[in-house]
Curated annotation (Swiss-Prot):
GO terms for biological process: translation. Residues 95-148 are annotated as: Disordered. This is Small ribosomal subunit protein bS16. Keywords: Ribonucleoprotein, Ribosomal protein. GO terms for molecular function: structural constituent of ribosome. InterPro entries: Ribosomal_bS16 (IPR000307), Ribosomal_bS16_CS (IPR020592), Ribosomal_bS16_dom_sf (IPR023803). Pfam families: Ribosomal_S16. GO terms for cellular component: cytoplasm; small ribosomal subunit. The lineage of its organism: Bacteria, Bacillati, Actinomycetota, Actinomycetes, Micrococcales. It comes from the Bacteria.
Length: 148
C-alpha cells in the first residue's frame, strides 16, 4: 500500500481549510484517511499551520511520502529537517522532538559531498573561452541610445 501525507480540503467555497492527513495514494482527495496529523488555514493572515510532529515523524519513518504541498508545510514547521537528521532545523513553530542518533537519513535527504577546503571553485576569470567585460564595444550608435 502506497501511503501519502497530503492535504484534505474542507471548508466553504473560497474559504479553504485543509487537514494534513495520511492516506492511501489511491483514495480520493477527500476520501477515507488513515490518520489526521495536522491542520492548515491558508486564508488567515498569517497562515495557521499545526502539525503533530511525533505522528508526522512516525509516518515519514515508515515510508509515507508527502505530496509537494505537504512537503512545503513540513519544511516550514521543521519536521522535514528533523526527519532528514539535521541537528538544528529551522522552524517557525517550535515542537520538541527527539531523534535517535543511530538512524541514518534516507537517500532523498542526503546532501552531496561538500567541496574540499583545498579545492577552489572556478571563477569567470579562470575560463579563457568567455569574453571579459573590458572586451565589450564601448561606442553605441545614437539611434539605439535614445530608445528605451
Amino acid at each position: 500500500m502506497a501511503v501519502r501525507i497530503r492535504l484534505k480540503r474542507i471548508g466553504k467555497v473560497k474559504r479553504p481549510f485543509y487537514r494534513i492527513v495520511v492516506a492511501d495514494s489511491r483514495t480520493k482527495r477527500d476520501g477515507k484517511v488513515i490518520e489526521q496529523v495536522g491542520k492548515y488555514h491558508p486564508v488567515q493572515n498569517p497562515s495557521f499551520i499545526e502539525i503533530d510532529s511525533p505522528r508526522a515523524q512516525y509516518w515519514l519513518s515508515v515510508g509515507a511520502k508527502p505530496t509537494q504541498q505537504a512537503l512545503a508545510l513540513l519544511k516550514l514547521t521543521g519536521d522535514w529537517a528533523r526527519f532528514c537528521g539535521e541537528e538544528n532545523p529551522v522552524s517557525r513553530v517550535e515542537q520538541p522532538v527527539s531523534i535517535e542518533a543511530g538512524k541514518s537519513a534516507p537517500k532523498s535527504c542526503r546532501r552531496s559531498a561538500p567541496v574540499a577546503a583545498g579545492e577552489a571553485t572556478p571563477t569567470v576569470s579562470d575560463r579563457p573561452d568567455l569574453p571579459s567585460v573590458s572586451d565589450a564595444p564601448q561606442d553605441v550608435p545614437e539611434d539605439v541610445r535614445g530608445q528605451a
